[in-house]
Amino acid sequence: MKNFMTEDFLLTTETAKRLYHEYAADQPIYDYHCHLSPQEIAENRRFTDLGEIWLEGDHYKWRAMRTAGIEERLVTGNASFKEKYQAWAKTVPQCIGNPIYHWTHLELRRPFGITDVLFSPKTADAIWDQCNEMLQQPEFSARGIMQQMKVKMVGTTDDPADSLEHHKFIANDNSFDIAVTPSWRPDRAFKVDHVGFKDYLNKLGKAADINITRFSDLIAALAQRLEVFDAHGCRSADHGIEIMRFANEPSETDLDAILTKRINEQALTELEIAQFSSAVQAWLGKQYAKKGWVMQLHIGARRNNSSRMFKLIGGDSGFDSMDDRAFAEPLSGFLNTLDQSDELPKTILYCLNPMHNEMLATMAGNFQGGGVAGKVQFGSGWWFNDQLDGMQRQLTSVAQMGLLSQFVGMLTDSRSFLSYTRHEYFRRLLCEMIGGWVERGEAPADMALLGEMVKGICAGNAKKYFGF
């Protein structure tokens, strides 16, 4: 029997231990996709207590608490963070087998240095006092935690209409050496069927100083904002796609007619929705290619399943799940449209349902070339898949159907400043997997070769791929 979460946590072979401790552990973090608030980084937010920094916006924890029978008042309601923290302490011992149990204890270890203590109602008060005292120190501010965790850059998630004022402030602050770059998230500009699309056109038009009444106006507004993002260091776009649609682009007259119908709040056909979203995204993809940006496609989340809870507390609150619809055909059509004119940017494909893993891994192989290593990639296990089984399945698919050596590695996709330990979680699993290959004679015991591969996957590949 092994002790829980030692320094060799998840590492069962000597090769795995060497790969992790000698090559992976000290690599910097390039967190190229996250949902951190740039304002909180700019203002160097200080957190009052452990409940606030742990529970304020973490829908993973919220889902677990609800499943454990915690009432909503103690999850997202008006209870104090001390009360919510106590409810969380009751929940965590029930989470064994869920990655949250590992994440919780990793987050206590780093950055707080709390080891050899299991989080529970019995230990919660002492941990509360110890962590709260540390949170008052400069190294436990938002920026301080990032520096402790050896973060080199983060890519936040930003709407085309955002001012980027906080990114500008951070870039001009010579006292902070971590790059905080915006990432272009244009979902509201191409999801013509969504509630609020008309209002969003007004918001985008105001940001670009363009009155959007025709398709060409929308493109002009997006083009103007693309330049602003590029000037602020943007290197990546991210499209959140619940339903992957594709249709051949119609005439601009037809696109104008679709836009006019939507502005007049008339219903659109499924074909019109596909035509409009495809046209906008195809135009965007070509712009990314010109600028050298990376295009990330997150596909297959089924959002806001509980309409009752959506009305009560809004989206991104723990009521999303995997969809199971097929999307190989429309995805292929979309990528091929860009590739036909050699205007496909570097692209990372993510699926929420792991039934699509092998499809995406092989789809990526269709569109390599141009002298770019790993130009199109099957991205890291996303959301419900950033746990041991999910990450191993994703890594195995990449290794068997692509080149694991070119993989750009892990990202947090998180709203929490304590989530950087997910990079450690990923790195340990990666080294365990490769170490297992060596122990079974499936890979050579060449530590220099494997060590460089591990270093690349942990940090170097992302740095090169995104141009950081």
Swiss-Prot record:
InterPro entries: Metal_Hydrolase, Uronate_isomerase. GO terms for biological process: D-galacturonate catabolic process; D-glucuronate catabolic process. SUPFAM superfamilies: Metallo-dependent hydrolases. Pfam families: UxaC. It is an enzyme of class 5 (isomerase). Pathway: Carbohydrate metabolism; pentose and glucuronate interconversion. It catalyses: D-glucuronate = D-fructuronate; aldehydo-D-galacturonate = keto-D-tagaturonate. HAMAP family: UxaC (MF_00675). Belongs to the metallo-dependent hydrolases superfamily. Uronate isomerase family. This is Uronate isomerase. It comes from Marinomonas sp. (strain MWYL1). The gene is uxaC.
